[in-house]
Design a protein with these regions (language model features):
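N-terminal "domain-start" segment that seeds a small globular fold
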Residues: 1-13, 35, 131
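Short acidic-hydrophobic, aromatic-tinged amphipathic segments that line or gate anion-handling sites
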Residues: 2, 77-81
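Short active-site neighborhood of thiol/selenol oxidoreductases, capturing the structured segment around
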Residues: 11-40
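Structural microenvironment flanking redox-active thiols in thiol-disulfide oxidoreductases
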Residues: 35-72, 86-87
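Structural micro-motif
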Residues: 73-76, 94-104
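Thiol-/selenol-based redox modules, centered on thioredoxin-like
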Residues: 100-139
Length: 139
């Protein structure tokens, strides 16, 4: 995988060292998706203690995704899902331009250990993620 800054991510190596959580966002401009990243960012101190890292998959142009990264200040790699190829392989597409918002927890074999599909302004799924990660101090 290559992120929007051109850095190469060895997913297998990453998953062997950390718990990898993939967050898919509907579009780079999605305000609810951006809110979720900001919510999770507020708990990074707890998540770091739980050995968790994140990857954010988004449709859209690099410029739009970079803007979303700037708005959220989410300090993890953002990956442009070109032609929604990754999302299609995970059955996470809404249409040809949008990804179904989801949270995926991968195991060390890159298999989905847990998933939460869907998101709205009343339901983000991050408390459920914290519970499955067994990270304490979640409000």
């Amino acid at each position: 995988l290559t992120d929007i800054d051109g850095s190469i991510i060895n997913l297998k190596e990453l998953a062997s060292k950390k718990r990898v959580v993939i967050i898919t966002i509907k579009t780079a401009e999605c305000p609810v998706c951006q809110s979720q990243l900001i919510r999770i960012k507020k708990k990074l101190n707890v998540l770091v203690a739980c050995n968790v890292t994140f990857l954010v998959f988004s449709p859209g142009s690099v410029d739009k995704i970079k803007k979303a990264k700037s708005i959220t200040q989410f300090p993890f790699p953002f990956i442009m899902d070109t032609n929604l190829a990754i999302s299609k392989s995970l059955n996470l597409t809404i249409d040809e331009f949008q990804i179904l918002p989801a949270i995926l927890l991968l195991n060390e074999n890159l298999e989905i250990e847990w998933e939460q599909r869907g998101r709205n302004s009343l339901f983000y799924g991050d408390p459920e993620l914290m519970k499955i990660l067994q990270c304490s101090s979640w409000i």
